[in-house]
Regions:
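Intrinsic-disorder-associated interaction segments
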Residues: 14, 18, 44, 48-52
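Short intrinsically disordered terminal tails
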Residues: 1-7, 61-70
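N-terminal acidic leader/helix
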Residues: 2-37
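Charged, low-complexity interaction regions
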Residues: 34-46
Length: 70
């Protein structure tokens, strides 16, 4: 996982080949949670839970990097 810092206010983390800001990651986690609540087939449910765990780890790394940069 890599962190990209464009300025003091634009810190992004890489997740699956794309760079995300904190609000984008939070929105993505929320959307996947909504899909889980609406019901998914077993395989898709397992993948969604894995994605949430990965995105939460990326979000934690991003928040840590933002805290260290202040």
């Amino acid at each position: 996982m890599s962190i990209q810092i464009n300025s003091a206010h634009d810190i992004r983390v890489e997740y699956r080949g794309h760079f995300y800001a904190e609000d984008e990651l939070r929105e993505s986690i929320w959307l996947v949670n909504m899909e889980l609540r609406n019901g998914l087939p077993r395989r898709e449910r397992i993948e969604a839970k894995r994605q949430i765990a990965e995105m939460e780890a990326a979000l934690k790394a991003l928040v840590t990097a933002e805290g260290a940069g202040r």
